Amino acid sequence: MSLPNPADLIRQMAVDLRAHLARRAITEPRYIGIRTGGVWVAQALQEAMGDSSPMGTLDVSFYRDDFSQNGLHPQVRPSELPFEVEGQHLVLVDDVLMSGRTIRAALNELFDYGRPASVTLVCLLDLDAGELPIRPNVLGATLSLAAHERVKLTGPAPLALERQDLASRSAL
């Protein structure tokens, strides 16, 4: 199975997001990307939407509930939100939705900054492996992978998807 082209997915996601926001009468959303791939997707999506407003970035490393199992990512950086969260309509963007734990961590962090009016979740890919009841409002594509496979977004320019085989990596 070949992987979809991120640029094609983002073009369609922009159409879908525009419709989603219009149905809810949201005219000035604030974009937030989850590091690192979610930031790249958010930048491309915001550009496709013709929106040049400041974008926020979240690093959810300290908010993950699997921190004690997986350890801390070696490149933790501070989150940057150049706008108030309180009362804002947020578009939260991630590259790959797998378990849902990253999104849960992102929501926890966002609520530490204030209470948003709404949060629209946008994901490039859903791997249909959810452990939590989290589903995106706007989605590029759903992929079904074998248990030993993962998908990684590379970028920032151009954005590309690559399949990774964890079984072959552990054999090394």
Swiss-Prot record:
Motif PRPP-binding per record, residues: 90-102
Catalytic reaction equation(s): UMP + diphosphate = 5-phospho-alpha-D-ribose 1-diphosphate + uracil
Swiss-Prot/TrEMBL GO biological process terms: regulation of DNA-templated transcription
Gene Ontology MF, one: uracil phosphoribosyltransferase activity
Keyword Nucleotidyltransferase: no
UniProt binding sites for substrate: 36-37, 77, 94-102, 151
Membrane-spanning residues: none
PANTHER family per the UniProt record, alphabetical: BIFUNCTIONAL PROTEIN PYRR (PTHR11608:SF0)
Protein family according to the UniProt entry: Belongs to the purine/pyrimidine phosphoribosyltransferase family. PyrR subfamily.
Function: Regulates the transcription of the pyrimidine nucleotide (pyr) operon in response to exogenous pyrimidines.
Protein name, entry field: Bifunctional protein PyrR
Organism listed in the record: Pseudomonas putida
